[in-house]
Amino acid sequence: MTNISVIAKPYAKAAFEFANEHNLLQQWSKLLQTFSELIKDKSVAAIVSSPTISQIEVVDALKKQLDENFFNFLALIAENKKMLIMPEIADQFESIKNIHNNVRVADVTLAYATDKNILDSLKTSLEKKFGCTIDMHINIDPAIIGGAVVKVGDTVIDSSVSGHLEKLKSILLS
């Protein structure tokens, strides 16, 4: 875990516990993602990190647009001058939420876009293999030539043509 992850985790955990207790997981998830995207914007990050404007002032400007509890959460982060780690807080919140809901993320890389039925079949197979709900994130990379590379947590399943060619090459060279 990096230093930012260590700092972000208690915020994410507190946000999750509050949102879960008050049946606000989806709402807080969206709010955290929205603020995460805002902070990733260079102009917003420049304002938040500006020595002339405090992070509290930035959050106070949003008070009327936000739910009181979410505002209080942001105010706490701003008081501790941690607004710039909002993307990490949002990511950790999603990870905690996924564990709670028995969901795992599968990063699936394909050589080209494919039929929805094939993706549904792949999702069903992965759910059986891992015993949980799978949230698939699809990436297209023509360099794999064909097939797929699936990453779920620390597990990598490489059934790509380029992966098979690399294995064949290493066998032939050994």
From Swiss-Prot:
Membrane topology, record value: Peripheral membrane protein
Coiled coil: none
Keyword Membrane: yes
GO molecular function terms attached to this record: proton-transporting ATP synthase activity, rotational mechanism
Annotated keywords: ATP synthesis, Cell inner membrane, Cell membrane, CF(1), Hydrogen ion transport, Ion transport, Membrane, Transport
Chief localisation class: membrane
PROSITE patterns assigned to the protein according to its UniProt record, in alphabetical order: ATPASE_DELTA
Compartments where found: Cell inner membrane
GO CC aspect terms: plasma membrane; proton-transporting ATP synthase complex
SUPFAM superfamilies: N-terminal domain of the delta subunit of the F1F0-ATP synthase
Homology family: Belongs to the ATPase delta chain family.
PANTHER family membership: ATP SYNTHASE DELTA CHAIN
Role noted for this protein: F(1)F(0) ATP synthase produces ATP from ADP in the presence of a proton or sodium gradient. F-type ATPases consist of two structural domains, F(1) containing the extramembraneous catalytic core and F(0) containing the membrane proton channel, linked together by a central stalk and a peripheral stalk. During catalysis, ATP synthesis in the catalytic domain of F(1) is coupled via a rotary mechanism of the central stalk subunits to proton translocation.
Assembly, per entry: F-type ATPases have 2 components, F(1) - the catalytic core - and F(0) - the membrane proton channel. F(1) has five subunits: alpha(3), beta(3), gamma(1), delta(1), epsilon(1). F(0) has three main subunits: a(1), b(2) and c(10-14). The alpha and beta chains form an alternating ring which encloses part of the gamma chain. F(1) is attached to F(0) by a central stalk formed by the gamma and epsilon chains, while a peripheral stalk is formed by the delta and b chains.
The protein's name: ATP synthase subunit delta
Species in which this protein is naturally found: Francisella tularensis subsp. holarctica (strain LVS)
Organism phylogeny: Bacteria, Pseudomonadati, Pseudomonadota, Gammaproteobacteria, Thiotrichales
